[in-house]
Amino acid sequence: MNCLVSGRVQGVAFRAAARRHALALGVTGRARNLPDGRVEVLACGEAEQVEKLRDWLWNGPPLAHVTDVVCAPVEVPEITGFEIE
């Protein structure tokens, strides 16, 4: 699943928190800042765990203020770990 997270999500440790949460759920993927101020999160794993991560994205870490999360299913090769780009 690929998600685009909007709001105050850069400069608030959003990517690092997403990585910690994803790894705790057993989800692999990546998180990266986009030039337009959003954060892109690519998540791979068991559907239930990926959905839990998606739900978490709506809150994010304490300093974040999420205004929108748009997710879409994507086909991705096998990913190990969770990277921050």
Residue ranges and their predicted role:
Residues 1-85:
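Intrinsically disordered, low-complexity, mixed-charge
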